[in-house]
A protein has these predicted regions:
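Phosphopantetheine carrier-protein modules
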Residues: 20-25, 48-54, 98, 143-166, ...
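A short N-terminal helical cap/helix-turn-helix that marks the beginning
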Residues: 88-95, 136, 150, 185, ...
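AMP-dependent adenylate-forming
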Residues: 1-135, 139, 143, 162, ...
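Adenylate-forming
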Residues: 3-7, 25, 41, 51-59, ...
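AMP-binding/adenylate-forming catalytic domain of the ANL superfamily
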Residues: 50-53, 57-66, 78, 91-114, ...
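Regions immediately C-terminal to embedded phosphopantetheine-bearing carrier domains
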Residues: 93, 118, 125-242, 263, ...
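AMP-binding/adenylate-forming domain of the ANL superfamily
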Residues: 2, 108-117, 121-122, 129, ...
Length: 745
């Protein structure tokens, strides 16, 4: 190792290595690794800069700030503000120097090298402050939303949403809240284009308010029949088609070690059921369609009588049927619970919800409310929480009012459906992956999972790659998955589904309910393009999809009207799930709580890549947990494990040289490569072409049946095959077909 840092860069003559700097010239700014050489390179691109060097200096506040030193190329000294703006065009916001010092000459060591220790200290009184507070109403609102969505104490004017930990999905929540608070209609794309508090507030302050009016989400009088939300309606239809399928069951099993107060637990769950209406709602059908019937809390029976199990095997035999048992949501409350007693101080609490009542983002508020209620009940009192500002039924009414009808061409629903019809027009019906078995005519929900890991170093490189290209880790992962799917299928027009939380309004944060929607991400992968180009394309694709994510997936399917099949899911067969929802931690007094595998795995499509970020105590990337879920109807674990290996290999390759053509990425390695590599030695195989083999067979036994040419009752001899082949060759020659010509068969 030399310590020199280089990167691949495209040029007219092909890829070249570009020197970036030394690895010992790196600093951490607000948790981000900064290559100082990249800042220097940006500065020296200015015509009036002959030389530049950047250091990390400690400000009086204790923060590390970037200070650049510049030697002018002539007598005309460049303006510091102009240089700062120049640098902004080449590096992310966190790499813009806090100040720039203009030098008359460079301090050198006795051997003629730059003496970094002799560079003058900057005047910290004029250094750009690390934190600038908001002043206007728009700035205050944007800063508050950034802090709220990202779980921070505060956000300053110069803080970048994505540098603070934002991502594609949290960006949609932030924009929705800013729009609601300020009465504007900003899009997710604008947050990517103006990611700092100051920049986005400036756009909000000048945004057109004439088209921004949306009804506020508030508690309001309900009609006699409350309709389902659009997401619930899809769940209801799926459930009525097959009430026995566990595909949309959400099982949660927790091992509680310690003295469990059963009565307090029973009362706590009663409190939670009363607080969250979806947990006590049934959805009967009628001639006018299904509707919500919210039951009184005392009508919901929770049987928490402990059932004794002898060992782990007996525990498993209880959990699996509990997790996979059917719900008929038209008459059954979409929740069941059981307590399994392993010993005096060891229990497993199993909770199963139907997806019509809860999604992944519901787990955190559900866990918090159970904690509060159980703690209160162990002290002999009810939980003292404030009433919910709105309930799920309020959301269902608000959603339908906001989206409007697809029969109204001016409605939001119609506008978004038009977008999807244009975007998905002509998309291939099916992505054919290499499988271990033929696809059955009727797909089942049987699934399994292959977990794998992405190391901390690679995680950090991926984060840096995303930041350098004004994208997010989700977008980089999506692009890498597209490369993998393109290689596996041989296709260039690919579709991947991804869930979106659907919780833009702050009133929905603490609610248990079904808000999630699925959008289709259509990507075109050109082998000659670089990964950098693909990330830019994916960025546009994803931003467009997230900006039109309110129309339910089933309505998109109806509008696009693809060829339907019971053998596969419509529009996409691969799902990408980026789990960046709030972690649901459950801590109960006097108990150690551990998650238990409920033992039921389902496959909603052929392949599902799930990714989750891990960070260390300082917020630095600490690796990613990953898993490929797959349909066992068509795939084996060994095959999917190979997919995982190839995916990690792609991530390594694109972080090492993002400008390399993606068609040049080597996705096969190790044992796979050995299987494909000819073994040196052994029996020699003569290099004889197929026409030569046919000619030899014609001479040796012209009237023998050509085994490769049998169609029904018709069989050709080698002589007949040779004659037919010659006739076809003459026809092609007469048509002007020559070597390397492409001919449709």
């Amino acid at each position: 190792r030399t310590g020199d840092v280089v990167r691949w860069r495209r040029s007219e003559g092909g890829p070249v290595l570009e020197y970036v700097g030394r690895s010992d010239f790196q600093v951490k700014i607000r948790g981000f690794r900064v290559e100082l050489g990249e800042i220097d390179a940006a500065l020296t691109r200015h015509p009036r800069v002959a030389f530049a060097v950047t250091l990390g200096r400690t400000a009086p506040s204790g923060d590390t700030v970037l200070v650049s030193y510049v030697l002018p190329s002539g007598d005309d000294e460049p303006d510091v503000a102009e240089l700062t703006d120049h640098v902004r065009g080449f590096v992310p916001a966190h790499m813009v120097p806090a100040t720039i010092v203009i030098l008359d000459e460079l301090p050198l060591t006795p051997v003629g090298k730059l003496d970094r220790q002799a560079l003058p200290a900057p005047d910290f009184a004029i250094v750009r402050t690390v934190f600038r507070a908001s002043t206007s109403t728009a700035e205050h609102t944007v800063a508050d939303v950034f802090a709220e969505v990202l779980g921070l104490d505060r956000a300053g004017l110069d803080d970048n949403f994505f540098d603070l930990g934002g991502n594609s999905l949290s960006a949609t929540r932030a924009v929705a809240r800013i729009n609601s608070a300020l009465g504007v209609a900003l899009g997710v794309r604008e947050l990517f284009e103006a990611p700092t508090v100051a920049e986005l507030a400036a756009r909000a302050a000048t945004a057109d308010r004439s088209t921004a009016a949306r009804p506020a989400l508030t508690s309001a009088p309900r009609p006699d029949r409350v309709p389902l939300s659009l997401a619930q309606q899809r769940m209801w239809i799926v459930n009525q088609v097959d009430t026995t399928s566990p595909a949309y069951n959400v099982p949660i099993a927790l091992r509680l070690t310690g003295e469990l107060d059963i009565e307090a637990l029973r009362a706590a769950f009663g409190d939670v059921v009363e607080r969250h209406e979806p947990l006590r709602t049934v959805y009967p059908g009628s001639a006018d369609g299904p509707h919500q019937v919210v039951l009184p809390a005392d009508r919901v029976t929770l049987d928490l009588t402990p059932v004794t199990v002898s060992d782990e095997a007996a525990l498993r035999s209880e959990l699996v049927p509990l997790a996979s048992a059917e719900f008929n949501v038209s008459r059954d409350v979409p929740m069941r619970i059981a307590v399994l007693r392993i010993g005096p101080d060891e229990h497993v609490v199993a909770l199963v919800l139907h997806h019509i009542a809860a999604d992944g983002s519901s787990m955190a508020p559900l866990a918090r409310d159970v904690m509060v209620a159980y703690t209160a009940r162990t002290h002999g009192r009810p939980p003292g929480w404030a009433p919910m500002p709105v309930q799920y039924a309020d959301f269902a009414l608000w959603q339908r009012r906001t989206l409007g009808s697809d029969t109204d061409p001016d409605s939001l629903l119609s506008a978004q459906l038009d977008y999807w019809c244009r975007t998905l027009d002509g998309m291939p019906e099916l992505l054919e992956l290499p499988t271990d078995r033929r696809r059955p005519l009727q797909r089942s929900a049987h699934g399994a999972t292959v977990p794998f890991a992405i190391g901390a170093d690679l995680h950090e490189k991926l984060s840096d790659l995303a930041r350098d290209h004004d994208s997010t880790l989700f977008m980089v992962a999506h692009a890498a998955l597209a490369v993998l799917l393109g290689r596996l299928s041989g296709e260039t027009d690919l579709a991947v589904g991804t869930p979106v939380a659907g919780r833009g309004d702050a009133a929905l944060d603490e609610m248990v309910g079904m808000f999630v929607n699925t959008v289709v991400l259509r990507t075109r992968v050109a082998p000659e393009s670089s990964f950098t180009d693909l990330v830019a394309h994916v960025r546009e694709t994803d931003l467009g999809a997230f900006a039109h994510a309110e129309v339910p997936f089933d309505r998109v399917v109806q509008a696009v009207d693809p060829v339907r099949s019971t053998a596969h899911t419509p529009l996409f067969q691969v799902l990408l799930e980026f789990q960046n929802t709030e972690k649901s931690r459950l801590e109960l007094p006097g108990l150690i709580v551990e998650v238990v595998d409920a033992g039921v795995e389902v496959a909603k499509c052929d392949l599902c890549l799930t990714l989750s970020e891990n960070v260390d105590e300082t917020g630095e990337p600490a690796g990613m947990s990953a898993a490929f879920g797959f349909a066992t109807d068509i795939l084996d674990a060994s095959t999917v494990r190979g997919f995982a290996d190839q995916f990690v290999r792609i991530l390594d390759a694109v972080t090492a040289s993002p400008d390399r053509p993606i068609g040049d990425i080597a996705v096969i390695g190790g044992a796979e490569l050995e299987c494909l590599t000819p073994v040196v030695g052994g029996l020699s195989v003569s290099e004889v072409s197929l026409p030569e083999l046919l000619a030899a067979s014609v001479v040796a036994d012209p009237d023998a049946v050509a085994v490769a040419v049998v169609c029904g009752d018709r069989r050709l001899t080698y002589r007949e095959l040779d004659e037919a082949s010659n006739r076809l060759a003459r026809v092609l020659l007469e048509a002007g077909v020559g070597a390397e010509s492409v001919v449709a068969v």
